[in-house]
Amino acid sequence: MPSARMGQEGEMGLGYGWIRPYIHYNLRVQPFRFHEVSGAYRIFKGVPDPVLSPYGYGDYTDKGANLKLALFSPEESRYQLPGLAIGLEDFIGTSSFQAYYGVVTQILPRYGLEVSIGYGKKRIHRWFGGISWMPFWQQQNMYLQSLAFVGEYDAIPYQNSNLEKHPKGHYQKTPWNVGVKYRLCNRVDLSLSWIKGNALAFSLSSFYPFGTTKGFLPKLHDPLP
């Protein structure tokens, strides 16, 4: 589920996710501190493409674009106030996964907590929420600082075939998802989750702050004339 957190200005990220019954690829760009644009490419595992599969091109796929705008970030108040964001999902493309939402996110640095609550329309149906807890973020052990335990209330009505397009994606035992996340070398995010009460999910993503980087190679002084 979405949160109101944003990346750094000029940041770009790539991601892969195995979230049964889909495989996800995504690209994320943060052109401004308050503006995030992302694209998603989904593979419907086990669902043949009616046009291309007979020619050996694999399963059915879907592409879409997402937009998120931060109206207020928690960093602006030094985490005294929550952040607020609105978003559109899959607003370009087939719109098979289209959703609209608003979300607030409160950061509690003292406890290593991030709490989000929001309301959505279409695929994200009504109230949703999420929590992330980093119990070791203030400790000296660099290997544990970025470990986070996460949970969320998933507001997607998977039983609705108009909103969940994959024929094997309708079954859900519980809307509560739990997982663990880990940031490696401050550039790579790994996550392992138990979703819908019946399936494991895995994701891997990497990001780089092109807007603030000093470059991959050192800048040499121009030679004197």
Where are these regions (language model features)?
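Transmembrane beta-barrel domains of Gram-negative outer membranes and organellar outer membranes
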Residues: 1-93, 100, 108-111, 140-143, ...
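Membrane-spanning beta-strands of outer-membrane beta-barrel proteins
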Residues: 20-22, 60-64, 97, 124-126, ...
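A short, polar/proline- and glycine-enriched secondary-structure boundary/capping micro-motif
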Residues: 49-50, 126-129, 201-204
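Short glycine-rich, acidic/polar surface loops and turns
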Residues: 130, 177-179
